[in-house]
Amino acid sequence: MLEIKNLSYRVESEEGTLDILRDISLTIEDNKFVVITGPNGGGKTTLAKAIMGLVPATSGQIIWNGKDMTELSVTERAQQGISYGFQQPPRFKGLRVRDLLALASGNDKLTVDECCQYLTRVGLCAGDYIDREVDTSLSGGEVKRIEIATILARKSGLMIFDEPEAGIDLWSFAKLTDTFRMIHNRRESTLLIISHQERIINLADEIIMVADGKITRQGPKDEIFPEILANTTAGCSYMTEGVS
């Protein structure tokens, strides 16, 4: 279970102190699919990065499975089963997909069959990818699904993804949503996804709306999603209905 208690993050600027996150508290039960959404600049990505340890909390606590993570490094949080998928995953020229999966798993003896299972689970034909380099020859959607495969190889209990729909085509996006649906159906991990995408939001068990550094609404999808759609109809949507 993920617990966030009174989390705040402030930065100093020429204009003075800026409150990026303001006293955020929430609880996410194990194996839930939760989407954080809201207007741009509202603090969604900063919240995700704070959970992973990529930005330091000014105050508050981050507790994962009963352990206080607040002062732990990114590496230490990863060792506790927290993983983070970036908007633009890194590429590694000269590094094969199978080697990346072995590194992610912490097992340099990871078998070809095990690598293929991870690739298959994210909708990639293993034979076409296992010996390819993770370089610019791969599309954005392919790299994102390979990144998800590495997170699966880590056997992460909490998977955080920051706008995974960014920069991918329609076909890749359909495969990506299938992958998230599959992960959730297996009930092996908690999914926390930052997204404006209606089709991703519609997969969630729960929706958290963040604006101006605060949680403005939180609840089951069946309760919150109709409100989001109503706002869309009213012409004040921050959602996107498709990808390029």
Regions picked out by a protein language model, each given a short descriptive name:
Residues 2, 19-23:
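Conserved structural motif at the start of ABC-family nucleotide-binding domains
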Residues 37-39:
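The feature captures the beta-strand-to-loop junction immediately N-terminal to the Walker
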Residues 52:
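Helix-to-loop junction immediately C-terminal to a conserved catalytic motif
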Residues 60-67, 114:
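Conserved ABC transporter NBD signature motif
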Residues 68-83, 228:
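ABC ATPase NBD coupling module
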Residues 88, 94-111:
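Q-loop/switch helix immediately C-terminal to the Walker
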Residues 151-152:
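ABC ATPase C-loop
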Residues 214-237:
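Conserved beta-strand-loop-alpha-helix hinge in the C-terminal portion
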